[in-house]
C-alpha cells in the first residue's frame, strides 16, 4: 500500500524527470513573469530596483509594535524603550522572543517546584491532624446514613 509520503516522493521524482527531459520551449518554470514568444522564453524588461530603507545588508527590517517593544525590554536586549530603534530585524525580534520563552519556562518550572513543595508540606500537616481522604469519606458516609435514618423516622 502506498503511503502519502511515498506518493509525494514519486510525484516529485516524476516532475523532476519531466522537467529535465522537456524541451526548452515547454519547460516548466516557477517564474511567472516569463513570456513565451515564438517558442522562446524571454524575461520582461525589469527596471533597476532602488534600494529601500527597509533593507540594510539584505536583511528586511520591521517596525516593532508596542508589545514587541516590551518583549525586547523584558528579554534584556534594551534597557529603556527610548533605546529601541525605529526598525529592527526579524532575527533580533526572534532572538528576543526565544530568550523570553526560556525565561518564562524557567519561571513555570520554579512555580511548579514551589507548588509541589507546598503540597507536600500541607499533606504532612493534614497527616498530623489525622486527616485523610479515607477518613473524610467515612465521615461523609456516616453523616449521610444519619440523615437518611432521620428522614426515614420523620416519614
Curated annotation (Swiss-Prot):
TM regions (residue ranges): 104-121
Pfam families from the UniProt entry: DUF1075
GO annotation terms (biological process): cellular response to hypoxia; neuron apoptotic process; positive regulation of apoptotic process; positive regulation of release of cytochrome c from mitochondria
Keywords: Apoptosis, Membrane, Mitochondrion, Transmembrane, Transmembrane helix
Localisation per UniProt entry: Mitochondrion membrane
Induction note: Induced by hypoxia.
Entry annotated with the keyword Chaperone: no
Residue span of region Required for proapoptotic activity: 77-103
GO cellular component, one term: cytosol
Disulfide bonds: none
InterPro entries hit by this protein: DUF1075
Membrane topology: Single-pass membrane protein
Main location: mitochondrion
Keyword Transport: no
Known role: Proposed to be involved in regulation of apoptosis; the exact mechanism may differ between cell types/tissues. May be involved in hypoxia-induced cell death of transformed cells implicating cytochrome C release and caspase activation (such as CASP9) and inducing mitochondrial permeability transition. May be involved in hypoxia-induced cell death of neuronal cells probably by promoting release of AIFM1 from mitochondria to cytoplasm and its translocation to the nucleus; however, the involvement of caspases has been reported conflictingly.
Family indicated by similarity: Belongs to the UPF0389 family.
PANTHER family, per database record: GROWTH AND TRANSFORMATION-DEPENDENT PROTEIN (PTHR13674), PROTEIN FAM162A (PTHR13674:SF2)
Self-association and partners: Interacts with HSP90AB1; HSP90AB1 is essential for FAM162A mitochondrial localization and pro-apoptotic activity. Interacts with VDAC2; the interaction is probably involved in inducing mitochondrial permeability transition.
Protein name in the entry: Protein FAM162A
Amino acid at each position: 500500500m502506498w503511503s502519502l509520503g511515498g506518493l509525494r516522493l514519486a510525484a516529485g521524482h516524476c516532475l523532476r524527470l519531466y522537467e529535465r527531459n522537456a524541451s526548452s520551449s515547454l519547460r516548466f518554470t516557477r517564474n511567472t513573469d516569463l513570456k513565451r514568444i515564438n517558442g522562446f522564453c524571454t524575461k520582461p524588461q525589469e527596471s533597476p530596483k532602488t534600494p529601500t530603507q527597509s533593507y540594510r545588508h539584505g536583511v528586511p527590517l520591521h517596525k516593532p509594535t508596542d508589545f514587541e517593544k516590551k518583549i525586547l525590554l523584558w528579554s534584556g536586549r534594551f534597557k529603556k524603550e527610548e533605546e529601541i530603534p525605529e526598525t529592527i530585524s526579524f532575527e533580533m525580534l526572534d532572538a528576543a522572543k526565544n530568550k523570553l520563552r526560556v525565561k518564562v519556562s524557567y519561571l513555570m518550572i520554579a512555580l511548579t517546584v514551589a507548588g509541589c513543595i507546598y503540597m507536600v508540606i500541607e499533606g504532612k500537616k493534614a497527616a498530623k491532624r489525622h486527616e485523610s481522604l479515607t477518613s473524610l469519606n467515612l465521615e461523609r458516609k456516616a453523616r449521610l446514613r444519619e440523615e437518611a435514618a432521620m428522614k426515614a423516622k420523620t416519614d
